[in-house]
């Protein structure tokens, strides 16, 4: 009898699984890559299959028992992973491909759909968020494009890929015992969460991803403004989002979730496996704060976020969960995860720069690429940002009514209008 290979589920995997169980989001990541010509489908299929050596969980199903959770190997062919849709209405097909659902319990954990017109292709990829965060997804895309390029050049190409570490333990191992104690005992000195009343009704049967772009000139202007005001681009994004929420809801008090990448704690020469290495901080704006100008709002945002950026307090929940999952039963650990991990209903995630030099598909020019997060269920609301070739894409995702989706599209435009000009 053949032994089934299994891989332990990390606490962060379980955390995302719980989010889907509790109807917060569908725990999928999404990307659209737009090319100037046709991809080689058979080469793409080979590349995806080879990439599973680096991330074997792609070809697994998730299994929970009373003893724990794991990823168990399944058998999938390339035809289960990559699909081709030939069409004269590419926008419609891209929208449909973007909202496909993966089956966590059955697998596979990735879906690639090539939307083909007579002259060009768009590649839509959906990845289970349990496997990777935004940075991990970019890491996977770079790997996929590299394998595709090498296989296109040499169809017999093969390489032995090592999965690497997926656990948060690799982050905590960087801290001496004294700092680990500090992580456990450091409490966030933060006001209670204030969720602004976003007017979303929700419709579980009507998912949609909405995105819009700014010009290179407008984004360059935003970067220049951030530098002049000793702020990060992320600070400017948060100020624009806070002002837009204030404009559309009339509320000043708000809490906006901000994911932070924990890879910064790893040695520079270490590349982790493709995984989730993210914690959360919160941008807090009080009812007494004055949001009368962009500059004032930026100052308030910086005052809230700056002390948290390098604070170990953000790691506390994740270190606690690592310990609980090690020492307690799975049932207790899962309940603890559900109780300890609670973030504001409104969030902004800056997935960051998609590196055009690392994302190269041989013989095809990549005209555009953006990544967006999971499809939310009301009242959860998120805006995501990515940049590619100096162009910014803002996106928002929701299982919602047509009225909800119109409201979200309008929100993105209002947010862009808040961007400062230099």
Spans of model-derived segments:
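Non-catalytic, low-complexity flexible loops and terminal extensions
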Residues: 1-21, 29, 131, 135-138, ...
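Short, charge-rich amphipathic segments
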Residues: 22-36, 69-80, 155-164, 168-178, ...
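Acyl activation and transfer enzymes in specialized metabolism, enriched
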Residues: 36-55, 125-142, 212-250, 394, ...
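Alpha-helix boundary/capping detector
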Residues: 70-78, 149-153, 157, 166-170, ...
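Short, charged, solvent-exposed linker or helix-capping segments at domain edges/interfaces
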Residues: 83-84, 153-156, 360
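Acyl-thioester-dependent condensation/acyltransferase catalytic cores
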Residues: 45-135, 139-149
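Acyl-thioester-dependent acyl-group transfer interface
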Residues: 1-65, 88-110, 247-422
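Secondary-structure boundary elements
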Residues: 117-120, 146-155, 228-234, 243-254
């Amino acid at each position: 009898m053949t032994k089934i290979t299994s891989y332990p589920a990390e606490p962060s995997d379980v955390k995302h699984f719980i989010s889907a169980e509790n109807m917060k989001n569908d725990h999928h990541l999404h990307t659209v890559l737009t090319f100037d010509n046709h991809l080689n489908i058979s080469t793409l299929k080979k590349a995806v299959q080879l990439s599973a050596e680096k991330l074997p969980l792609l070809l697994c199903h998730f299994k929970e028992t009373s003893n724990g959770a794991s990823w168990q190997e399944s058998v999938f062919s390339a035809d289960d992973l990559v699909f081709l849709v030939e069409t004269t209405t590419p926008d419609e097909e891209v929208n449909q491909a973007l909202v496909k659902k993966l089956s966590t319990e059955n697998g596979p954990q990735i879906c690639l759909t090539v939307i083909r017109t007579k002259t060009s292709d768009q590649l839509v990829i959906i990845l289970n968020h349990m496997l990777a965060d935004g940075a991990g997804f970019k890491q996977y895309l770079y790997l996929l494009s590299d394998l595709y390029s090498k296989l296109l050049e040499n169809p017999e190409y093969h390489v032995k890929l090592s999965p690497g570490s997926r656990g948060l333990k690799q982050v905590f191992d960087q801290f001496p015992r004294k700092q680990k104690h500090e992580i456990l005992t450091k409490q966030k000195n933060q006001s209670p969460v204030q969720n602004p009343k976003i007017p979303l009704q929700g419709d579980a049967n009507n998912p949609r991803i909405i995105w819009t772009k700014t010009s290179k000139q407008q984004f360059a202007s935003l970067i220049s403004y951030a530098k002049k005001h000793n702020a990060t681009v992320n600070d400017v994004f948060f100020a624009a989002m806070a002002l837009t929420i204030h404009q559309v809801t009339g509320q000043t008090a708000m809490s906006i979730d901000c994911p932070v990448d924990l890879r910064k704690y790893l040695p520079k020469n270490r590349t982790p496996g493709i995984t989730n290495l993210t914690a959360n901080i919160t941008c807090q704006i009080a009812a007494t704060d004055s949001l009368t100008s962009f500059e004032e709002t930026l100052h308030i945002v910086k005052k809230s976020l700056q002390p948290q950026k390098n604070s170990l307090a953000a790691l506390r929940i994740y270190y606690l969960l690592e310990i609980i999952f090690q020492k307690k039963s799975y049932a207790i650990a899962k309940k603890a995860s559900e109780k300890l991990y609670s973030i504001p209903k409104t969030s902004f995630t800056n997935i960051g720069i998609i590196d055009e030099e690392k994302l190269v598909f041989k013989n095809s020019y990549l005209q555009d690429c953006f990544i967006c997060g999971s499809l939310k269920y009301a009242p959860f609301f998120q805006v995501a940002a990515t940049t590619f070739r100096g162009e910014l894409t803002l996106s928002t995702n929701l299982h919602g009514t047509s009225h909800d989706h119109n409201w979200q599209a309008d929100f993105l435009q209002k947010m862009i209008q808040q961007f400062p000009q230099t």
